[in-house]
């Protein structure tokens, strides 16, 4: 019996975090955190949401460039780590803006309370 969609997404998230921060690590941008992985029902695509600790615009674009440049290597390394599925999904990396949005809302609420 195969893994459920949620368990597989969780496993992919864990493995991608290790692969990105160990195998393709770039000291200029620092730590990249994989926040969420969403799989399509047919498991052909995985939307991988990530944030970086240094969220200045030049570092965001550098992180996106490094991830895109190494996407095939990341997928290959993921395939070596996860062997109990037939096909590794195509990875689509998306910068996660939800943390920034949450901070923005928090600042608005703090301004209202003053």
UniProtKB/Swiss-Prot annotation:
Gene3D superfamilies: 3.30.300.20. The keyword Thylakoid does not apply. One of its GO terms (cellular component) is cytosol. GO terms for biological process: maturation of SSU-rRNA. It comes from the Bacteria. One of its GO terms (molecular function) is ribosomal small subunit binding. It is found in: Cytoplasm. Keywords: Cytoplasm, Ribosome biogenesis. Its main location: cytoplasm. InterPro entries: KH_dom-like_a/b, RbfA, RbfA_dom_sf, Ribosome-bd_factorA_CS. Monomer. Binds 30S ribosomal subunits, but not 50S ribosomal subunits or 70S ribosomes. NCBIfam families: rbfA. One of several proteins that assist in the late maturation steps of the functional core of the 30S ribosomal subunit. Associates with free 30S ribosomal subunits (but not with 30S subunits that are part of 70S ribosomes or polysomes). Required for efficient processing of 16S rRNA. May interact with the 5'-terminal helix region of 16S rRNA. Belongs to the RbfA family. This is Ribosome-binding factor A.
